[in-house]
Structure formats: C-alpha cells, structure tokens
C-alpha cells in the first residue's frame, strides 16, 4: 500500500457528493481481495450487489471500520506458524480428528494444512478483518465516498 492518509469521520465522508465513475477506478484497491462483477479475487465478500440494500453512511462505515462488523463466513481469520514460516487467511474447514484444516489464502487459493505436525501453531484472530483501513491504503475522504457511491449503484 501507499503512504497512509488522515481521514475524516464517517458522517463527514458520507455527506460528500459521490462520483460512481471515480469510485469504480478507486475500487481497484478493493479487487485485490473482493470480486466486483467479473473483476477481482474471491478472498473477501462478493461486493457486486452488496451496497444496493445499504445506505451511503452504512457503506462508508463498513469501509472505514473493517473490524467493526465481520461478514458471515469471513469471521474466522487465522494465522499459522511453523518456525519462521507464516500462513494467514480465512479458516474454511477444520477437523480436529483428522488433524487438518483448510485455509483460504490471499488470492483465493485454498490449502489443506496438517496442524498436528510438530511445531505448527494455529492462532485464531478474534474480531480481526484482513481488510486494511482506507487510510492505510492511502485513500482520501473523496475516494471512500466515491467507492461508496459506486457500490451503492452497481
């Protein structure tokens, strides 16, 4: 990501006038982990129709505060460690009896991990979203508002 930015609060950003065409361009940041139409990767929730039933303020809030409300099915972020190797992603299947789990990695690939192997540590991350904040992505207030406008009108 680029240099961080300082953003206003949700209400201030939601009150800006949004531009869906600019939002489509700014949403390229989102397609690193999300599908929007045919573009993007299936790591995070599908965003194609996601914004239609939400207010602009709700969309802005979800973008600004990704840890506040995790989407169903995306609420099991995990980190696996073995020595200096680390795998991070979303828990997709777990079998204590078999000693294995499936983790959805960034990019959408699913890997089976045998966690009972010596030295493998599984850390479940509570109330954690892999989605970075818009300030960490270097987005401006207007970028966030434009993305919200774009998602609302898909």
Q: Where are the language model's segments positioned?
A:
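Electrostatic cytochrome c docking/interface patches
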Residues: 1-26, 43-45, 54-61, 81-86, ...
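C-terminal capping alpha-helices of c-type cytochrome domains
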Residues: 1-9, 64, 87-89, 94-99, ...
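Inter-heme linker and motif-flanking segments adjacent to c-type heme-binding CXXCH motifs
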Residues: 18, 37-43, 68, 154
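The canonical Cys-X-X-Cys-His
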Residues: 23, 27-37, 47, 147-151
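Gly/Gly-Pro-rich "capping" loops immediately C-terminal to redox-active cysteine motifs
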Residues: 40-65, 76-125
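Active-site phosphate-binding and catalytic loops of NTP-dependent enzymes
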Residues: 69-74
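Small-residue transmembrane helix packing/gating motifs
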Residues: 124-132
């Amino acid at each position: 990501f680029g240099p961080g930015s300082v953003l206003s609060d949700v209400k201030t950003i939601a009150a800006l006038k949004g531009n869906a065409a600019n939002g489509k361009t700014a949403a390229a940041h989102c397609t690193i982990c999300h599908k929007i139409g045919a573009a993007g990767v299936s790591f995070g929730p599908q965003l194609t129709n996601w914004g239609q039933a939400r207010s602009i303020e709700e969309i802005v809030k979800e973008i600004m505060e990704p840890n506040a409300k995790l989407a169903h099915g995306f609420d099991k972020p995990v980190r696996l460690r073995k020595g200096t190797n680390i795998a991070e992603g979303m828990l997709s299947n777990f079998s204590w009896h078999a000693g294995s789990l499936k983790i959805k990695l960034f990019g959408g690939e699913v890997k089976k991990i045998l966690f009972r192997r010596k030295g493998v540590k599984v850390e479940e991350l509570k109330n954690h979203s892999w989605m970075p904040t818009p300030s960490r992505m270097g987005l401006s207030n207007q970028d966030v508002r434009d993305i919200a406008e774009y998602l609302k009108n898909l």
